[in-house]
UniProtKB/Swiss-Prot annotation:
The keyword Transport applies. ATP binds at residues 174-181. The lineage of its organism: Bacteria, Pseudomonadati, Chlorobiota, Chlorobiia, Chlorobiales. Belongs to the ATPase alpha/beta chains family. This is ATP synthase subunit alpha 1. The record marks 367 as: Required for activity. PANTHER family: ATP SYNTHASE SUBUNIT ALPHA, MITOCHONDRIAL. It catalyses: ATP + H2O + 4 H(+)(in) = ADP + phosphate + 5 H(+)(out). GO terms for cellular component: plasma membrane; proton-transporting ATP synthase complex.
Length: 511
């Protein structure tokens, strides 16, 4: 009896195994596994991954990731991302079958993250809506719209002389410690309440410098509309290299939703150096200044992603402010000339003007905006044309007067007027002004109302004009912010307001 029961149990078990084998389809997955042969200064050399693709993400022992940069038949050169101290030769490596991507979404607003999307602000993991590749093709020609809307920086010299439009790429360049980052930060602060998303991308910056910028943004309430993507100087070169691409993908997410985005790359000099270091370690042929031959393409494919999309695609825009550091005022060096040719204009900051206290130290003669003028508000165009000409004449006469030449009355008046223009274009760091304040000051300046004042009185006069501008009638404010030129009646009302504000000081002085 027991034998029969045992036999039946065995038969039933074998039958179930047979049935399972007929219905079960085993899943076989082929994976390429390689071996790390060399780890050196932020790169790794791997053997045994013959099918890996260019810029494919590679996972190595200890959870270290890298991007395949050199794809040779026998060996793959991988740029390491993140901490790699525990990675050693002999470690395992495998393909992931995907490219590097970054988390995107509204949950990143107000956060400080690294290019991998990992938080640096001790506020926990950020909420995100999805992921986008860090390398994306730039919009086609037929997907773009003309730059037609101004992006106000809050700085008189920029908004009046070298205006920036939404979707433009405006280079900021100058020697170290001349106020390049200050202009970019002021522009971010001025977007508060203007429905513009801002992205600050720090590339290989000192931790103290980044902390200062973030403190300024928080102090002025600008972090609510800002995402900070940060790499420090001690981060691996690979992480510094991907930082601007990751930040741009975050910005493109908002742009494709029809929103306006401003992105600051601080700075692309460090980015170029990081790419040069990686290329030399991977034994790529060096070119001019030891940079690899494709350094122009590295930056052009990044900046071409900034644009103003046509209405059918949402009408969003991505405005780029790349920053470049020059050496000894040499703007004809390799990287600066590359960026000047890629961008739509440049703002050059002169160390000479900086040392003289003319802040922001914008050299008007070497600064230009190739497309922003078409986006500038009409009220600016009504007042800045004469200012540019007067200032150019003043600079020429000032150089001439240094030789001790006696000047006629007209020349002396031109110098007096030019000195007031230069004084009016000065602005304290992060002290941004609204459109109505700038236009009232510039109109009063162009009409010579500042000429009777002493230079020491100009700063106080501008403050009184700013206060008066904030009290202008609503209908006049709306016209100043519109694209309609100033009418004769508008000019008369503005000049009366300016004269009344300036008269207060004179009356107070007589009393």
């Amino acid at each position: 009896m027991q034998e029969k029961t045992l036999t039946e149990s065995i038969d039933a078990a074998l039958s179930s195994i047979g049935e399972a084998s007929r219905t079960t389809q085993p899943e076989i997955e082929l994976r390429e596994n390689g071996v790390v042969t060399t780890v050196l200064n932020g790169i790794a050399l791997i053997r045994g991954l013959p099918g890996v693709g260019y810029e494919e993400l590679v996972e190595m022992s200890g959870g270290v990731y890298g991007i395949a940069f050199n794809v040779d038949p026998d060996e793959v050169g991988v740029v390491l991302l993140g901490e790699y101290a525990k990675l050693q030769a002999g470690g395992r490596a495998r393909r992931t079958g995907r490219v590097m991507d970054v988390p995107v979404g509204d949950g990143l607003l107000g956060r400080v993250v690294n290019p991998l999307g990992r938080p640096l602000d001790a506020e926990g993991e950020p909420r995100f809506s999805g992921r986008l590749p860090i390398e994306r093709p730039s919009p086609g020609i037929m997907d773009r719209n003309a730059v037609s809307t101004p992006l106000q920086t809050g700085l008189k010299v920029v908004d009046a002389i070298v205006p920036i439009g939404r979707g433009q790429r405006e280079l900021i360049l100058g020697d170290r410690q001349t106020g390049k980052t200050a202009i970019a930060v002021a522009t971010i602060l001025n977007q508060k309440g203007r429905n513009v998303i801002c992205i600050y991308c720090a590339i290989g910056q000192r931790a103290s410098a980044v902390a200062k910028v973030l403190a300024q943004l928080r102090e002025h309430g600008a972090m609510a509309h800002t995402v900070a993507v940060v790499t420090e100087g001690n981060d691996p070169s690979g992480l510094q290299y991907i930082a601007p691409y990751a930040a741009t993908s975050i910005g493109e997410y908002f742009m494709e939703q029809g929103r306006d985005v401003l992105i600051v790359y601080d700075d692309l000099t460090n980015h170029a150096r990081a790419y040069r270091e990686l290329s030399l370690l991977l034994k790529r042929p060096p070119g001019r200044e030891a940079f690899p031959g494709d350094i122009f393409y590295v930056h052009s494919r990044l900046l071409e992603r900034s644009t103003h999309l046509r209405k059918e695609l949402g009408g969003g825009s991505l405005t780029a402010l790349p920053i470049i550091e020059t050496e000894a005022q040499n703007i004809s060096a390799y990287i600066p000339t590359n960026l000047i040719s890629i961008t739509d204009g440049q703002i050059y900051l002169s160390p000479t003007l900086f040392e003289l206290g003319n802040l922001p130290a914008v050299d008007i003669g070497k600064s230009v905006s190739r497309v922003g003028g078409k986006a500038q508000l009409a009220a600016y165009r009504s007042v800045t044309g004469r200012l540019k000409l007067a200032y150019a004449q003043f600079e020429e006469l000032e150089n001439f007067a240094r030789f001790g030449t006696r000047l006629d009355e007209a020349s002396r008046k031109a110098i007096t007027h030019g000195e007031r223009i230069r004084e009016c274009l000065k602005q304290d760091e992060l002290d941004v002004l609204g459109v109505e304040e700038q236009i009232l000051i510039l109109l009063s300046l162009s009409e010579g109302q500042f000429d009777p004042l002493e230079l020491s009185e100009v700063s106080g006069a501008m403050k009184r004009l700013s206060a008066a501008a904030r009290e202008l009638p609503r209908d006049l404010l709306e016209r100043l912010h519109s694209d309609r030129p100033l009418s004769d009646e508008d000019r008369r009302r503005l000049l009366q307001t300016a004269e009344a504000a300036l008269q207060k000081k004179r009356t107070a002085g007589r009393l």
